[in-house]
Each structure stands twice: as structure tokens, then as C-alpha cells.
Amino acid sequence: IFASSLLLLPVTISTFSGNQTGPIMSTVLAYFGPGQPLYLLFFAAMIVFFTYFYTYNVSFKTEDVAENLKNQGGFIPGIRPGKRTEDYLTYVVTRVLVIGSAYLAFVCLLPAARDHPRPAGDPLLLGGTSVLIVVSVVMDTINQVQSHLLAHQYEGLIEKSQLPGKRGKTGAAKPRKAPARR
């Protein structure tokens, strides 16, 4: 989202200026317009950059995770707590981000490559960011449905496991009668 917003900034500026775009802006729009090779190259580079930037600076700080593991008595098997855990987490996250950022760039560039050249009058615009949002919403919906179905399976299992006898249908023990006094 950050990459596409920054790359569409020249188009947005030219829209506000009306039909009067200077020669510099016309050149920028010609080379960096959506679907152009330089646009796609910068888009991929910015996706990779923002993937690393966001992961390391916002969502997953390895020093904080290593410190939390150490404070809570947790550890990674074979890795000593503290600085070595932090180094190991940095190593693993870097390797995962190489594959993850390449995948994100591929998914975001795929619609642009598919639509270029675009037939005139084609109203369907489906960008890479839209694809990512749709896929994440579908995956989240599937996870919610699966957890709901699993909860119903557990309810059925609990109902089937209750034994008849001293317990009622709810599984609660029947109250005892007080002994008779003589």
C-alpha cells in the first residue's frame, strides 16, 4: 500500500494541476506511469524495502522478542538466551523476509504484467494490493469457519460423553436427599 501510494503521487499531482503539465512532469508520467517498466521496477523495489522496514522497525523487533523470551524463562533449543537468541532471530527473519518480499512483489506485479497491454474500455482494475487484501480476507474467513466447526464438534463430543445415571442431561450431579431423622 505504501509503495503504490508513493508511486501514484506524480499522477495525483498532475491530476490536481489540470491539463497543464510541464515537460518534466510529462516525462515523469511517461516513464513512471502505471504499467511502465520503470514503474514496475520501482514498485518491486519499494515493496521489498517496505517489507523489511515494516518488519524490522514496527512488527517484529528481534531484541524485544529475545528479551521477552529471556525474562519469561523461554528459550530456543540449542541457542543461548540473550544476544545469541537475538542474532538467531535476526538470521531467521532475514531469510524468511527474502522469500516473503519476493512473493509479495510477485503477487503485486502479476496483475500489472497480466493487464499490460490493456484492451481499451476494459473496466476491470484489479491491482496487486487488492489481490493481497482479498486473499487475506478469504483466509481469515476460512479460519473462522474452521474454528466454528471445530467448536461444534467439541460440543457434540461433550454431549455424547456424558454418562446416564446419577447425572442428568447437563452432566451436573443430582442433589442428594438429607438422611431421615428418628
Swiss-Prot record:
> Which keywords has UniProt assigned to this entry?
Cell membrane, Membrane, Protein transport, Translocation, Transmembrane, Transmembrane helix, Transport
Q: Which Pfam family, any one of them, does this sequence belong to?
A: SecY
GO cellular component terms, semicolon-separated: plasma membrane
Return the Gene3D superfamilies for the record: SecY subunit domain (1.10.3370.10)
Compositional bias (Basic residues) spans? 166-182
Q: Which residue ranges traverse the bilayer?
A: 30-50, 92-112, 119-139
A GO BP term here is:
protein transport
Annotated region Disordered: the residues are 163-182
List the subcellular locations. Answer: Cell membrane
Entry-linked SUPFAM superfamilies: Preprotein translocase SecY subunit (SSF103491)
Q: Which InterPro entries match?
A: SecY/SEC61-alpha (IPR002208), SecY_dom_sf (IPR023201)
- Kindly indicate whether the keyword Cell membrane belongs to this entry: yes
State the membrane topology.
Answer: Multi-pass membrane protein
Q: Which family does it belong to?
A: Belongs to the SecY/SEC61-alpha family.
What does the UniProt record say this protein does? The central subunit of the protein translocation channel SecYEG. Consists of two halves formed by TMs 1-5 and 6-10. These two domains form a lateral gate at the front which open onto the bilayer between TMs 2 and 7, and are clamped together by SecE at the back. The channel is closed by both a pore ring composed of hydrophobic SecY resides and a short helix (helix 2A) on the extracellular side of the membrane which forms a plug. The plug probably moves laterally to allow the channel to open. The ring and the pore may move independently.
The entry describes its oligomerization and partners as: Component of the Sec protein translocase complex. Heterotrimer consisting of SecY, SecE and SecG subunits. The heterotrimers can form oligomers, although 1 heterotrimer is thought to be able to translocate proteins. Interacts with the ribosome. Interacts with SecDF, and other proteins may be involved. Interacts with SecA.
The identity of this protein, by name, is Protein translocase subunit SecY
Organism the protein comes from: Paracoccus denitrificans
